[in-house]
């Protein structure tokens, strides 16, 4: 919508050039760098989500979400959802307005940028934050083990009938 709504034509085409430059900068990362930036980003995003769950008021939810997200933006970390916008906007703007950007192709964007960032986001969110919370709160909880065992007994009884 942004590209085909002719928004990049604003400011004499400078906005189109800025969109392409932003997308190109995101796709110029090496695969390990993109992966690590993805891990660090989603650690902060997941912490923001968990902190907002802990807050009771809307103002607390907003404030606890704001700071980690602001930090990941300031640090230049990468999130796959943001990359889906910036990369696609850059590719479409480049094609629509004829702005040359060496190395900015769909395959390079998908496999050298979006894939490692997405995998990094998964590792950061599920691997670091998820496992961290499990180790901190659920690993040594006898209730969780008993609940699973009780559910398994109920399933075994149900299978007998």
Describe the role of every protein-language-model region.
Residues 1-161:
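Alpha-helical transmembrane segments and their helix-helix packing motifs
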């Amino acid at each position: 919508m942004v590209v085909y709504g002719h928004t990049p034509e604003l400011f004499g085409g400078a906005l189109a050039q800025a969109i392409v430059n932003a997308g190109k900068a995101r796709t110029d990362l090496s695969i390990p760098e993109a992966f690590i930036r993805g891990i660090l980003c989603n650690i902060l995003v997941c912490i923001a989500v968990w902190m907002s769950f802990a807050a009771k008021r809307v103002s607390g939810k907003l404030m606890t979400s704001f700071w980690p997200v602001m930090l990941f933006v300031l640090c230049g970390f990468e999130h796959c959802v943001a990359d889906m916008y910036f990369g696609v906007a850059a590719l479409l703007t480049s094609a629509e307005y004829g702005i040359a950007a060496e190395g900015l192709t769909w395959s390079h964007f998908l496999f050298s940028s979006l894939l490692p960032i997405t995998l990094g986001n998964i590792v950061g969110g599920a691997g670091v934050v998820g496992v961290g919370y499990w180790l901190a709160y659920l690993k040594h909880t006898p209730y969780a083990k008993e609940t699973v065992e009780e559910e398994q007994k109920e399933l075994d009884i149900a299978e007998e009938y």
